[in-house]
Amino acid sequence: MLKSTQVILIFILLISIVESLSWLALGLAANRFDRDKPGTSCKSLKGLTRRQMRFCKKNIDLMESVRSGSLAAHAECQFQFHKRRWNCTLIDPVTHEVIPDVFLYENTRESAFVHAISSAAVAYKVTRDCARGISERCGCDYSKNDHSGKSQFQYQGCSDNVKFGIGVSKEFVDSAQRRVLMMKDDNGTSLLGPSQLSADGMHMINLHNNQAGRQVLEKSLRRECKCHGMSGSCEMRTCWDSLPNFRHIGMAIKDKFDGAAEVKVVKEDGIEKPRIVMKNSQFKRHTNADLVYMTPSPDFCESDPLRGILGTKGRQCTLAPNAIDDCSLLCCGRGYEKKVQIVEEKCNCKFIYCCEVRCEPCQKRIEKYLCL
């Protein structure tokens, strides 16, 4: 029988796990951030933990970048998964709250991707906005600028300040992983036992995937240069470090999703902190840059509201055997129906001098295939 203290602490642990992604609802908040009234602006936001609320009040000038990051993360997730059974439906556009995707809190592959992409997106938006001068506390990274003239190129201009962006992401995004300290009785035994280890393991894996996403961002920095010299001889180049389009980062994290490592969390005697290890010890150990997960993903075929799974009924599919959204795969063997839609479009357009464009109305037949 669990004691009342254990029940309360287990409840707190579960709440902290559920809150780990709720801040993504920031992207749909309608209000703007008033720098003169940080308390009012932050209190009106949904989904923030207490630590994130404190961050908001102290760093109101960065919150627009954080919100842009949540939007970018959601958009990129939907792009990468729009043809799959789980299409990254995360936020309810009516309530502006994160849909309770329970499976995301079970440390699945999908959870790993969402944590990594959201962490990277916040760092990305803060970094780019710093270069635009949105905050007096950050700007370009001039640390690499070289004025010695010894090399064939010189770092000059505005390099993206990735270190600052990563620091903000780590402080804001990682703070959602609230930790409840291990509580022990007089004999040194954990009051929560396996529940504590399980919750600690979930937090550790979420933090690992957050960091993996930021590593992808940092490694994506590329050097851009401009040539100087007579007749384009490029005798001297001035260079700066710049981040690519966020789509490039999203694709890199998606590749890591495809190769994610299945792990488990173990607590060894004499070592206070649990460790993340490969579930199958015969496989090569994961690295800090790999995405990791503990729970195999559901098949997402049937609707399961209690777990936040929408199912694939009514989803549009294609008749392409090798495609991810092929009807036989997306519809989970339930079959599909064909719907024909006639739409009117403009065609045979001609330019009439002067200055008019005349078109003829045309009907176009569109066939759609929907999962049963």
Swiss-Prot record:
Leader sequence segment: 1-29
Lipidation (O-palmitoleoyl serine): 231
Disruption phenotype: Defective ALM, BDU and QR neuroblast migration and irregular HSN and CP axon growth and guidance. Double knockout with cwn-2 results in ALM and CAN migration defects. Double knockout with either cwn-2 or egl-20 results in HSN migration defects. Triple knockout with cwn-2 and cfz-2 results in enhanced neuronal cell migratory defects.
Annotated disulfide bonds: 77-88, 130-138, 140-158, 225-239, 227-234, 301-332, 317-327, 331-371, 347-362, 349-359, 354-355
Membrane-related topology note: Peripheral membrane protein
Compartments (UniProt record): Secreted, Extracellular space, Extracellular matrix; Cytoplasm; Cell membrane
Glycosylation sites: 87, 187
Role played: Ligand for members of the frizzled family of seven transmembrane receptors. Probable developmental protein. May be a signaling molecule which affects the development of discrete regions of tissues. Is likely to signal over only few cell diameters. Binds receptor tyrosine kinase cam-1. Together with Wnt ligand cwn-2, regulates the migration of CAN, ALM, BDU and HSN neurons during embryogenesis, the migration of QL and QR neuroblast descendants during larval development, and polarity of ALM neurons. Also acts with the Wnt ligand egl-20 to direct HSN neuron migration.
Family in the record: Belongs to the Wnt family.
Name of the protein in question: Protein Wnt-1
Organism classification: Eukaryota, Metazoa, Ecdysozoa, Nematoda, Chromadorea
